[in-house]
Swiss-Prot record:
Alphabetical list of InterPro entries matching this protein: RsmH, SAM-dep_MeTrfase_MraW_recog, SAM-dependent_MTases_sf
Reactions that this protein is recorded to catalyse: cytidine(1402) in 16S rRNA + S-adenosyl-L-methionine = N(4)-methylcytidine(1402) in 16S rRNA + S-adenosyl-L-homocysteine + H(+)
Localization, UniProt: Cytoplasm
Name this protein carries in UniProt: Ribosomal RNA small subunit methyltransferase H
MF GO annotations: rRNA (cytosine-N4-)-methyltransferase activity
Keyword Transmembrane: no
Length: 305
């Protein structure tokens, strides 16, 4: 399935022991997909395989292609799903490692497409990936470890103007100019904790004991820039409807207002899509209690016409 297909790769060689992720809105996503026997479905952000697992547990014959930028995510998903498909000749699974915006989809290929955006819990929790300031790690933040651009490259080499722009536009950080100016004056920075501690010192005292850590928005902006998350989402939504058969469902879970705004407006503006959710579907109180990540999740659906 292309240069980045995982077929034939020994996934056992990939470290997956720590890649555990609880999927959000699993019931709403699978039910909204309306799977049918013999259907062909695309999980565009497989993560650890939670949503695909729900789909396979329906027990119907189907074909499934799973995408993720992170090779560890695909390995974890395959290990998780193997018991469900080991004796099923009527189920076909393909994997493709890379950015969903670059997937070589074909015209009217799928009966349904789902995507769960953003960074996964294992990526946040694995200290060496550099996504979180809870762990001391190199400033990395790459979802795809084969790409060249890292958070360290951005922090230590981009201009003050560009740093302020990504912190403001992608992180919605009101102190973006102040933080960018201090970074340029005091760089280089090598680790997540060095940067986070410095940001904490630079912001006014009233921001140091708020609901979120003073570095949270800066780190979000940095991560989105490293992985071109919003640009990739725009490209994906522009292409994916062409891969859907007529009547096929397209569901996307977003986790912050920037993503949700793109999904909402692109679904509405795309001529061959009909919006099925005037308001986004959100997690119930019980799911939010069990999985705090679900609190910010919003699911929107569209249908190919």
């Amino acid at each position: 399935m292309g240069a980045k297909s995982m077929e034939g790769m020994n996934l056992k060689q990939t470290a997956i022991a720590d890649f555990h992720h609880v999927s959000v809105l699993p019931t709403a996503l699978v039910e909204g997909l309306e799977p049918k026997p013999g259907g062909y479905y695309l999980d565009a952000t497989v993560g650890a395989g939670g949503h695909s697992e729900r789909l396979l547990k329906l027990g119907i014959p189907l074909a499934l292609t799973m995408i993720d930028r992170d090779v560890q995510a695909i390995a974890a998903a395959m290990e998780r799903l193997q018991p469900l498909v080991a004796d099923r000749k009527d189920i076909s699974i393909n994997t493709w490692q890379g950015n969903f915006a670059d997937f070589p989809g074909q015209l009217e290929q799928f009966d349904g497409i789902i995507a769960d955006l953003g960074v996964s819990s294992p990526q946040l929790d694995q200290g060496d990936r550099g996504f979180s300031f809870r762990h001391t790690a190199p400033l990395d933040m790459r979802m795809d470890q084969s790409q060249d651009l890292t958070a360290a490259e951005i922090i230590n080499h981009w201009s003050e103007k560009d740093l302020a722009r990504i912190f403001y536009e992608y992180g919605e950080e009101r102190l973006s100019r102040r933080i960018a100016r201090q970074i340029v004056e005091q760089r280089p920075f090598q680790t997540t904790t060095d940067l986070a501690e410095a940001i904490t010192k630079w912001v006014p005292g009233k921001y140091r004991h708020g609901r979120i850590h003073p570095a949270t928005r800066t780190f979000q902006g940095l991560r989105i820039a490293v992985n071109d998350e919003l640009g990739s989402l725009e490209k994906f939504i522009a292409q994916a409807p062409h891969w859907l058969k007529s009547g096929g469902k397209f569901g996307i879970i977003s986790f912050h207002s920037l993503e949700d705004r793109i999904v909402k407006h692109r679904f509405r503006e795309t001529e061959n899509l009909r919006v099925l959710t005037k308001k986004p579907i959100i997690a119930g109180e019980e799911e939010q209690r069990q999985n705090p990540r679900a609190r910010s999740a919003k699911l929107r659906w569209a249908e190919k016409i």
